Amino acid sequence: MYKLFKKLPLIYILSIFIFILISSEHQYPQGWDELQSNEEWELVKKTDRVQISIKQLNVSPLPAFKAELISDVNSDKLAEAAWLVAKSTEVFPNAYIIDAGVYYKQGVTSYTAFQLFDIPFLSPRLYQFNSIRLGNSIHWNRADTISSSYNPDKILLPPVNFGSWEIQNLGHQSIIIYRVCTDPGGDIPIWIVEQANQRYLPLMLIDLETYANKKIVLY
C-alpha cells in the first residue's frame, strides 16, 4: 500500500484524505446502507424514459423510492444542477416547492438547507436537511439540530427524510439515480403519497435534466 501511495501524485493523495475526512463528518441515518443497496427493489412504474422502484425500509411506514433516467446531458452539469438547492423552485418547477435556500455552508461541499413544499390539499411541509457532495453524488439527511427560530410559523417538519442523487457516466450518456426515504408526517394515507411519488418523480428527473442542459455552464 505504501509503494502504491508513493506512485500517486501528491494532490491525488490529498484529495483521498479530504474525501474521507468530509464523509466521516456527515451523519448517516439508520437505513442508509439499505437504501443505497441495489437489492430488493421492486419496479412499479416505467415510462419511456424513467423507471420507478420501491423498497420497504424499517425506518419509515412509507416505502423508499428509486428513480432512474438515462440522459444525453453531461454528468457534471446534472450534478451541479442537483446541488443548487437555493434554486430548487427553478430546477424543479413541478415539485410544489415554493421556497428553498441554504441556512449555512460548511466549505464548498456541504451545507444545511431547506425546501418548503406546498402540495394541494395538504398542509405545507418544511424539509430541513444536511447535504454533502462527494464528486457527482449528493447525500442528504434530515437536520435535527436546527434552531426553532428557523421555523417561526411552526410548519410541519417531516420526521424522516434522507436520500441521494447519484450521477454516473454511461459511455457518451449519463444515468441519474435518485433515492429517497421520507415520511412526510401528518395524517396522509400511504397510498396517496405512493401515487404522488410515482407521478412526480419522473417529472422531477426530467426537470433536472432540462435545467442542467439549458442553464448550467461548466468552466
Region spans (language model):
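Eukaryotic helix-grip
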Residues: 26-219
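N-terminal Sec-pathway targeting helices
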Residues: 2-12
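Bacterial N-terminal signal peptides
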Residues: 11-20
